[in-house]
Amino acid sequence: MRTTKLLLTLIIGAVCQFVPQLGHAQDINNFAPVVVKTVPEAGSQDVPPGEFEVKITFSKEMADQSWSWSTAWENSGPEFIGKPHYESDHKTCVVKVRMEPGKTYGWWINSPKYHGFQDPQHHPAIPYLFTFKVKDQ
């Protein structure tokens, strides 16, 4: 009798684990956005100095006026020239910056503390460390 109850409990437990997965199909719209491309390419070491358009492209459309460019360390962000904006695809955020020769820059595109980059359903983008180095003169 005890063996039958134990076996029945194990079977019910195993079935219950799979039932929620069958009832809820995965939908890309419910996933958090991720960075899929950067300009300059993350890790680049030959970015030209001076004015430059930095672009961050996400895996899905993003909410307008929603971003959080957090410095990765003290003074790690270049000087912004103007305000960030999204291109017409609503996936690519662009900001014009001024960069100094020979300097390494880094941002967190979202972070544990700041999560302004969000899709229209308010899913914050997965934090992404974006670093690059500017060429010497």
Question: Where would I find each of the regions flagged by the language model?
Answer:
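Bacterial N-terminal signal peptides that target proteins for export
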Residues: 1-8
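Bacterial N-terminal signal peptides
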Residues: 9-18
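Sec/Tat signal peptide C-region and signal peptidase I cleavage site
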Residues: 19-24
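Acidic, low-complexity Ser/Thr/Gly/Pro-rich repeat segments typical of extracellular/periplasmic
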Residues: 26-137
